[in-house]
A protein has these predicted regions:
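C-terminal motif of bacterial Sec signal peptides marking the signal peptidase cleavage site
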Residues: 19-23
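Low-complexity, intrinsically disordered short peptide segments enriched in small/polar/basic residues
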Residues: 1-3, 16, 434-437
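Bacterial N-terminal signal peptides that target proteins for export
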Residues: 1-11
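Extracellular beta-rich repeat passengers
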Residues: 27-86, 94-108, 113, 118-448
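Processing junctions and N-termini across compartments
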Residues: 15-18, 59
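Generic N-terminal leader segments that precede the first folded domain
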Residues: 10-11, 24-27
Length: 448
């Protein structure tokens, strides 16, 4: 059985998708042609034969996209069908459409690039809110996102949107834009690894169920001043390992952790979040008190340790009522740095709604305990309370992929962490849809 090896922080996979083709190189990239050249009575059910491309052979029941494609309407991956997207494919979503483009995954998605050839989801105008996102269904069993760039999503759905019709995201109502990636099957599983989520108008991710590993990703420049936006928004029904991610400029929170939605069939969430780097988060308008860096509510009980919070609006926070399950959580030690006196005050002991631990490492004066990133430029006008998405008024600079958030030699952040905690998936997660792929190109036959 092939598994994601999170112990070694290696999450590599490959997948592919185009139109159904029988044992031949697939030249057709029409994403709406669910059958081989259409009309064989197999609509929306995947191929009846093995699909062979230059990269791999894919099992019966597959869709395979091998080349770049442009979407002008939403695509639905049916239950029981697996969509594979091969390395290097770019999916461009058109923005000038009546109903925002969504990719609704009722079946499985294996969207796996490589470091040299990432899979890219973008838009034609490259502006936030140009399209919706990847929205998964209640029967979606497996999703793999490896070396994937996802940008410019977050559009608000309409009643004609697939996500609304399938009652997938906030069922039965329209409440702002959809996340760039949403997973909801309590019994399903997903992995997000080595990927770059950026410039999405609302939440980068939103989880209401599922077993997942989120590792080695960058989440940058999410949300908007009017509606906010989290990088990682977790409700009840999840089991998650979240590690080694960089979260930059999340408008509201890097993490919003909650057990909202818990029921007889939706269990309380279990989560281990560790070794994450959180920078410049929480600048959104002050009328929403949840803006900050990490918000824990409704009996959430995460393991949240060894994380670095850098120049974010607040420290760890919870509401006055219905906050974290403090008895069953582990929320310390973490490392908090502030380069301004305002930042120091807003994460200090006694700060409104703050959760304080003496075992945390915190700046007590501006600039103290600088973790010394290898390469990072902070805005000269940086203001943790700016409340407007304007660099001139103190909002964060746009993310620069040349920045390096590893620590320099001698950094005070190189010590003080702990190792006496457990991951949820110490041996990784198996993805059976990948086990069925026979790679023909050794450069793309990835270890997972």
């Amino acid at each position: 059985m092939k598994k994601i090896n999170i112990l070694a922080c290696m999450l590599l996979m490959a997948a592919a998708t185009t139109v159904f083709c029988t044992s031949c190189e697939n030249d057709n990239i029409n994403p709406y042609d669910y059958v081989n050249n259409g009309g064989n009575g197999n609509e929306n059910q995947g191929s009846k034969d093995v699909i062979k491309t230059n990269v791999a052979e894919y099992p019966v029941g597959s869709m395979v996209w091998t080349k770049d494609t442009t979407l002008s309407e939403s695509v639905e991956i049916p239950v029981g069908t697996s969509l594979y997207i091969e390395p290097g494919v770019t999916v461009t979503c058109k923005s000038e459409v009546q109903v925002p483009v969504e990719i609704v995954v009722l079946g499985n998605l294996y969207c796996l690039g490589t470091a040299q050839k990432p899979v890219t989801f973008t838009s034609d105008t490259k502006k936030p809110e140009d399209w919706g996102g990847i929205i998964c269904g209640f029967e979606s069993e497996e999703v793999v996102l490896n070396h994937v760039d996802i940008a410019y999503g977050g559009a608000t759905p309409t009643e004609s949107s697939l996500s609304y019709q399938h009652r997938l995201f906030k069922p039965g109502k329209i409440d702002g834009g959809v996340p760039a990636f949403h997973f909801c099957n309590v019994n399903g599983k997903f992995v997000m690894a080595n990927s770059f989520f950026h410039d999405n108008y609302n939440d980068q991710t939103y989880f209401t169920g599922g077993n997942g590993v989120i590792i080695n990703n960058i989440f940058a420049d999410s949300g908007n001043a009017a509606d906010g936006g989290e990088a990682i928004n977790v409700k009840a029904g999840c089991k998650l390992d979240v590690a080694n991610n960089v979260i930059y400029n999340a408008c509201t929170n890097a993490f919003k952790l909650s057990n909202a939605g818990n029921s007889e069939v939706i269990p309380l969430t279990e989560m281990a979040a560790y070794n994450n780097t959180i920078v410049n988060c929480g600048w959104r308008r002050s009328k929403n008190k949840k803006g900050g860096s990490v918000w824990v509510e409704k009996a959430a009980k995460p393991v949240f340790v060894n994380n670095l919070i850098y120049d974010s609006r607040y420290g760890l926070k919870q509401p006055k009522q219905d906050g974290a399950d403090m008895e069953h959580s582990r929320l310390t030690p973490n490392y908090y740095f502030a380069s301004t006196e305002t930042g120091v005050e807003q994460m200090a002991k006694g700060a409104s709604l703050g959760i304080w631990f003496d075992s945390d490492i915190k700046s007590t004066v501006a600039g103290q305990l600088n973790p010394l990133f290898k390469s990072f430029k902070q805005s000269d006008k940086m203001n943790v309370n700016c409340e407007v998405d304007d660099v001139a008024q103190g909002a964060p600079l746009a993310f620069d992929k040349t920045w390096n958030f590893d620590f320099q030699e001698g950094s005070p952040a190189l010590s003080g962490g702990v190792t006496d905690f457990a991951r949820l998936f110490p041996n990784g997660l198996p993805f059976f849809g990948m086990k069925k792929v026979n790679f023909l190109d050794t450069q793309n036959d990835q270890n997972y």
